[in-house]
Amino acid sequence: MSRRVMFKFRLYLAGDALNSAQALANLSAFCREHLPDRHEIEVVDVFREPKRALADSIFMTPTVIVLAPPPVRRIVGTLSHTLTMLLALGLDPHVP
């Protein structure tokens, strides 16, 4: 995958729950390290926007939807495993 591709994430969280805070911190750190200047993160709180969560079929939090590049993917959990994230995004884990 080209190193210039823009990644767009929509992260669904449940208020200020610990696992929600961890997911946001982990996704932000991952993007800073592996996708500098090539990412956008939209955060949606399911308590504040439940209809939006239902429209996107979000039934567990935290869940991140990778909107771009295609295909659309979902990753559930705190996003703490860097290798899993790299592979899910189609990035080479051996490229710094």
Where are these regions (language model features)?
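Thioredoxin-like thiol-disulfide oxidoreductase module
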Residues: V44-M60, L89-P93
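Local sequence-structure signature of Cys/Sec-based thiol-disulfide redox active-site neighborhoods
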Residues: S2-E33
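Ser/Thr/Gly-rich flexible loops in soluble cytosolic domains mediating phosphotransfer, phosphorylation
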Residues: L79-P96
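Solvent-exposed alpha-helical segments within well-ordered globular domains of core cellular machineries
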Residues: Q22-A25, A29, K51, L83, ...
